[in-house]
Amino acid sequence: MDISAPQSRADSRKDRWCPGERCLAPSLDNKKLCEASIKSITVDGNGKPFAVVLYPDFQEKTIPLQRLQEVKSTKDYSRSLIFDDKDLEKPYFPDRKIPSLASAFQLSEDGDSIPYTINRYLRDYQREGAQFLYRHYIEGRGCILGDDMGLGKTIQVISFLAAVLHKKGTREDIENNMPEFLLKSMKKKPPSTAKKMFLIVAPLSVLYNWKDELDTWGYFRVTVLHGSKKDNELLRLKQRKCEIALTTYETLRLCLEELNSLEWSAIIVDEAHRIKNPKARVTEVMKAVKCKVRIGLTGTVLQNNMKELWCVMDWAVPGLLGSRIHFKKQFSDPVEHGQRHTATKRELATGRKAMHRLAKKMSGWFLRRTKTLIKGQLPKKEDRMVYCSLTDFQKAVYQTVLETEDVALILTSSQPCTCGSGQKRRKCCYKTNSRGDTVRTLCLSYLTVLQKVANHVALLQAASTSKHQETVIKRICDRVFSRFPDFVQKSKDAAFETLSDPKYSGKMKVLQQLLNHFRKQRDKVLLFSFSTKLLDVLQQYCMASGLDYRRLDGSTKSEERLKIVKEFNSSQDVNICLVSTMAGGLGLNFVGANVVILFDPTWNPANDLQAVDRAYRIGQCRDVKVLRLISLGTVEEIMYLRQVYKQQLHCVVVGSENAKRYFEAVQGSKEHRGELFGVHNLFKLRSQGSCLTRDILEREGQVEAGIMTATTWLKGEPSAQELETPRDPDCQEPTDVCELYSDISDEESVGHSLGKTDKHKFSDTSRTPGFPAQLTLLQCGFSKLFEAKYKSDQDGDGNPVPSDGSSDEQPMCLSAEARQAARQKTWDSVCTSEHQKSDNIQTPDEKCVSDKSEKTLEQNVSSESDDETKDHRTAGHHCMGQGDTESEDSDVIFPTQYPTQRIPKNHIRFKLLLGESEDSEAENPVKVNHGDDRQNSGRGNGPVPNLLCLENMTSKSVRKRKGTDDISDESDDIDMFPKSRIRKQRATTSLKFKRKKENKRKLDNSPVTAKEANQVCAADGDRSSQVIEDFSSSDDNLSLSHLSFTKLSHRAETVKDKISLSPKLPGPDKKNNTFISRKPPSFLNEGVISQEQICNSMDKILDGVQEVAYIHSNQNVIGSSRAENHMSRWATRDVFELKQFSQLPANVAVCSSKTYKTQVKANIVSPTEKDQPPSDGGISSPLYVSHPVVQKKKDVYRTNHTTFIIGETPRGIRRKQFEEMASYYKLPVKEFAEQVTRATSEERQKMLRDFYSLQHPEVKEFFVNSASELIKSVHKKEERVRNKSKEKESLLKENPSNDSTLSCYDSTNKMSQVYNRKICEGKSVRSQNHVFHREDTFSSDAEINKSPVSFTEELHSERKDHTPKDTTTVFCPNSNSEALEAELGNSPGRQWDLTGACGSRNRPLFKLRNKRVENPGSENTPEDGLLGDTSILNDLFKSHGEGPTQLPKNVLSGPVAKAKQKPKDFWDILNEQNDDSLSKLTDLAVIETLCTKAPSTSASKRKDELEASLWKANEKFLWKTLSSDVDDESISNTERE
């Protein structure tokens, strides 16, 4: 090619040329420069270099190098070289876009840096990992990189090696790797740096994968020490011709001396958890390697026990954790014993303290990151445990194995020998059985047999069974198969059919159903099994079913593995791949599969997790479903629970988490074998369908629920993020107390227990983060639940007054009239608007009813009319309620939708405890007295939350951020679209129980319809739809459920596109029997989810399989919870700070009397503090800003081309705009945040206006009158509250009736009657008081102007308007009555009417001094609160004449005059000094007659109980002589009498 303008491309000459390069050389014809390539470079005799140039016409010519010129590439000119610099860069991914700029990452000031060719592909945490390795290498010490699998430990090591070996990833590396003689011929000096060598030890399965990765990411000189060529490679290493040597554990053991003779810069060990046994040969070899810098790579540094952690760390950093004995005493024993479910506070506190000490000691030497770092790049994963019942044949075989003599020998091996030697049987006279097998050998053999039977009985007929097991199996089969001759005959005649027949295995029946479903759905399935013999059975089943499959196990060659994986991922015909659980390593990247089925568990949880990660990894595009099949009641269940035990221990030690404490067992402890360890737990068959896992999870769930409820109501630390707007109510059905279960919670999700019915399932509302309902103490496992009536204020028209913010309403039982009125007013609007705006299905959240067996305090404050009673008998309790929003990190357990049991006739209507309202975060102190000096206390999130205002419903809800601790990582800022949001909902905890067939057939004649309301949640800017269904990734349509309840069971019937109301409901409701189908909001770009695919969810599929006994989500079983954090914090505080309660169970929440007054002071917050989120700091007061945010306006403004949405900015956008504002005002983010918190509302609005108007000037118009409008709204609100207070006061003055007083007295005495009967000896007591105030105000003046309303007028208003009122429930411990008084007296806007008390121990429950509810401003004697209201005696002293009663002339000056409207009390009678009155007072007959004739305001059905209550409560009471300085003990005795 002729070059007409050579100067344009040949501007410079190169000093060095390489063969293969293109150049500009003089043409053979006209001497003009033309393009050619250098074939070779030679030197003449004078030392002058020449190049043999090859022209395009294949002619060659020798030309001096100085005449050659470099070709400069242009846009319209091809490349000058065969491979230019970019082509020679490593790594080079032509199909991938370069993610970042080409810049090196500096590791030190000396110049060591990660080359830009590698750095541009690294993530931040990977750079941090490389820097961690480099720092320890420079300091000459070892370390452990413990990242999860899939985070790129290999690339972090390669980055570190590239920096240390000064690699550039370009042509320069190629030249530096050339032999020295070539470098000399090119007049290039060899690298002056000292030659370094690194040894990498890895398992054989990943050895060549390391080689491929090193070749991909850089120009490294690598040798592999393995196989027949290892001697030659050792010679090269001795000549230091290599930089990196790869070898296996076995080769290292064989060549230890030769390798120790070399000087290694560092040794890097992959899968370092293999160095876990101090006595193992591999550990001894690894510790014998002569190298100071030992780097270990492992994702599971602790797999079984803490001894393994010590062994690995002691290899990497000898002496870091001390000796093995020291480590066991200082760390291992405290941590493991503190992890027990029944641990004491001292054990838990000591364990947590040891955990923190261990984490601090390892922090500089151990680096671990989890997959949460990349969860934004991973799809959703749903992990389900499916418990399969054994078939009758399997049970017979399993039971026969357990009844053998050998198993009996195993079970009695630890008992004292019968010879009287004092030794155990296995060490004395019963060392072996009759055939000479030791107990240990028998134990392992029979465990294997039990595992085979639990999976498939056909495994017992396997031809490859060992001789020893063959003998054992033959004896077992002879006994069992005599009862099943059909199996033996089929095994002989048609072994293939027998092995593939699912009827001999419960798991196979379940697997058959699953595979049929996944084949229809075109899903790709990975089927894992630990046993290759079981894989043979599964393979034969696939062949018999005509399924196209592939198989990969340990016998598969490496080259075949790649082919199988590639074919499975790409082919649409191959939907099943059978994989051995232990076949890990090279090429197993099954991202084409979206379903993983683990047919059998292993003892090591890492094996199962690694199997799951074969499909759940970066590159996976679909949601992954994980199903683990467990044989119910067998040894497999123990295996799975031991996995949970080990994973929880790993969370504590490695993750430094307060892991949930499920088990009472401690591994290796003879005293605490618990439910996991010991041969008695292994060789056992739990019959009758009982599930140990369910029992354990329920037990822990109840503790979690109780602690979180106590925390929420006692300590003021909310268990969920509240919604700002209410949602639709639900119709509820009572459930038997004994069926109230609680299960473990979700990450941002909440679990449930649910009975599995035939082909129908409830859509579980509690599994949606937006719809959990708050717990009652009864549901939390507490035996004392107080019934309460909640009332809301009404305006002048009788309509409910909405609260300012959200009202976190709980389901409550309304009277028939109230329900009818509410439905008439709101049903149309709710049904038409909510279903169109919402995408969340809401089903009944809570069902509550009393059980006679429960020692529940029964107090019904309001009387029920006959119509109400009739309504309850016919249609049940229609409880209308709304659940709180649950944050993703919350672990509160909400038991919902439990199997309904027979309801007692004398059932009690319970009200669920309320949550906290958005605008109310003042906290009320609450305590529980257990009668044994143990106290349960904390701060309650008060004031009492407001009830849902049905007319004020909206379909939007915004989560309120509680604090910085709740801010999640960056993936939370990504807007989740409907499909991903649906995935998130399904990753929740669920419990499903197998029901008996006879229960399924029973249907009630009066069904109760549950309205399921959808709701679009705008939390964190997430507008995505949330669908409640059990386990399907299908998202085409929403479903509605028609619920029918019976006495023994309830079932859901799917109704398409409509909801029909029960015929039992009042007539006006029937006009809305049909609802229009719901449509997604316009901003959603997703189609409607089809009903058909909803029905095809996993639970629907498994519903018809009889062998499925129990299903629960494994999503959040592992790890910590907020409740566990609370218990750990309380235990540490009590043991190490307060030095008390150290021997109490850690699950008991105890409030210290030393700090309770401090808590009370912290709980009494100012109105400005109420609007601020509570802090997570235990007993510290909440953080607040001086000028709280009061702007809650949400509006939409539209201009010509722009739409402005105010008040609904997503969280991720808010963070981004906040950073932009900080840069706009030229301040660091932290300083800008502090400035914002100090600024007033007007200043903040001005800042916002200035910022937004910079880009959009029209925004200024939106900020003009916002401040003034806000002030007006606040004043208007305060005025409304003042007017209502005056209205109530005037009403009180006009109607001071004796009936109201009597009502209070009757109710109080009835309560006292029940108290004295059940808990007078120190049980916890809770008094109920009703306050009429519904709204919190922005100013203290409005609160001061609120006038108190007595408890009795509340009862009248309840009967009058049937409107729910707020209820405040107080737990008062006997040891802190003064603190309670301070709280009751200082709480603004709240007056407490404590008229009834019950003695506890030797101290009074309430002792109110200087406080009178009727006249708070007056001073009273301490005895005023002792006798309470004696208005029942009014008739005794009533004047018989028309004129008023004449008072005596001489009146004592001591007591203060009573209020105008106050009835006579005991002290008024004494002050009158009327002998006639005093004689009547001491006349027993007169008192008895008076009590008999006392009018009752309660229903007639309670009259007998009321009279008995009055007489018993006042016996020997009125004339008891007490001095003014009476001690507490005498007061308590008086109250009990």
Curated annotation (Swiss-Prot):
Domain Helicase C-terminal: 510-660
Compositionally biased tracts (Polar residues): 1295-1306
Keywords on record: ATP-binding, Centromere, Chromosome, Cytoplasm, Cytoskeleton, DNA damage, DNA repair, DNA-binding, Helicase, Hydrolase, Mitochondrion, Nucleotide-binding, Nucleus, Phosphoprotein
Post-translational changes noted in the entry: Phosphorylated by NEK6.
GO molecular function, one term: DNA binding
Intrachain disulfide bonds: none
GO biological process, one term: DNA damage response
InterPro entries attached to this UniProt entry: DNA/RNA_helicase_DEAH_CS, Helicase_ATP-bd, Helicase_C-like, Heliccase-ass-bd, P-loop_NTPase, SNF2-like_sf, SNF2/RAD54-like_C, SNF2_N
Gene3D superfamilies found in the cross-reference section: P-loop containing nucleotide triphosphate hydrolases, Tandem AAA-ATPase domain
Motif segment (DEAH box): 270-273
Composition-biased stretches (Basic and acidic residues): 755-764, 834-857, 1276-1292
Phosphoserine: modified positions: 968, 971
Span of domain Helicase ATP-binding: 134-319
Predominant subcellular localization, coarse grouping: nucleus
Family: Belongs to the SNF2/RAD54 helicase family.
Record function comment: Promotes double-strand break (DSB) end-joining and facilitates programmed recombination by controlling how DNA ends are joined in a spatially oriented manner during repair. Also plays a role in DNA repair by restricting DNA end resection in double strand break (DSB) repair. Facilitates replication of complex DNA regions and regulates the maintenance of chromatin structure.
Assembly and interaction partners: Interacts with NEK6. Interacts (via an atypical PIP-box) with PCNA; this interaction facilitates cenrtomeric localization of ERCC6L2. Interacts with CYREN; this interaction is DNA independent. Interacts with XRCC6 and XRCC5.
Domain-related comment: The atypical PIP-box motif mediates interaction with PCNA. The helicase C-terminal domaine drives nuclear localization and recruitment to damaged sites.
Protein name: DNA excision repair protein ERCC-6-like 2
Gene source species: Mus musculus (Mouse)
